[in-house]
Amino acid sequence: MAKEKIILTGDRPTGRLHIGHYVGSLRRRVELQNSGLYDKIFIFIADAQALTDNMENPEKVRQNVIEVALDYLACGLDPTKSTIFIQSQIPELCELTFYYMDLVTVSRLQRNPTVKTEIQMRNFETSIPVGFFTYPISQAADITAFRATTVPVGEDQEPMIEQAREIVRRFNYIYGETLVEPEILLPDNAACLRLPGTDGKAKMSKSLGNCIYLSDSADEVQKKVKSMYTDPDHLRVQDPGKLEGNTVFTYLDAFCRPEHFGLYPVSYTHLRAHETVL
């Protein structure tokens, strides 16, 4: 009997989802959901993991669980095709995390590139919450509990999945072939790996105030688009513009397709060809 093809993916409910999430993961989840290539798709809202750096504000996490669920539905994730669940409602995941802790050393967690980056971003370098530090172990529990064969992630999360694979191999070595070792599914479009903020900074972030949220109204979206960073040296219409570092063109790459430019000559078959026209 062929092994079931199972996807598991999710988000920490630390805030409303924005178009960076859509480009980076949500759009692809919908495509995978509708592809018919997978037997089961599990998408979870990782509220327990969100508490690891939001313990002082559980109400924020609780409210964001609802916001993320609404964003999922708005993007096209279909509960009749994908199983959407809340992490904290499955206590066995915490139990499995506890047992997996015996298979991982502190030094190995410290070497995880994703963990090191996240610690620096959150200024945890002198005092790290244990729950946050062991986040990769919790993620391994999520993946293996549902016997996921495929985990779609961005390149920045690849070390986390590799850590899960290490845990699986060690567990199976000790206890026999029990757990499924997941495969990593990376984005196939380089332009969609990470969408910059509207101010041109490398990352779209709520704390930086440079997000366009999926739940923004039409007026809010229009206001944010009109204020986007473009080319500060392009002062007059007749001045030549620069494409490099121009956030607008990055967004066009992410959201537009050649068919969106039907009014332009048919010889322009790729979005990049339209940049000279625009």
Please give the residue ranges for each predicted region.
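Hydrophobic/aromatic-lined pockets within catalytic cores
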Residues: L73, L77, T105-R108, A145, ...
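Single conserved hydrophobic/aromatic residue that forms the stacking wall/gate
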Residues: H270-L278
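Conserved phosphate-binding loops in nucleotide/dinucleotide-binding enzymes
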Residues: L17, M55-I66, L70-L73, T83-I90, ...
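Short, compositionally biased segments
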Residues: P265-Y268
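Feature 926 captures the class I aminoacyl-tRNA synthetase adenylation module centered on the KMSKS loop
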Residues: N172-A202, K206-S207
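N-terminal Rossmann-like or analogous alpha/beta NTP/dinucleotide-binding catalytic cores
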Residues: A2-A141
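Internal, conserved structured core segments that host functional sites
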Residues: F124-I167, F171
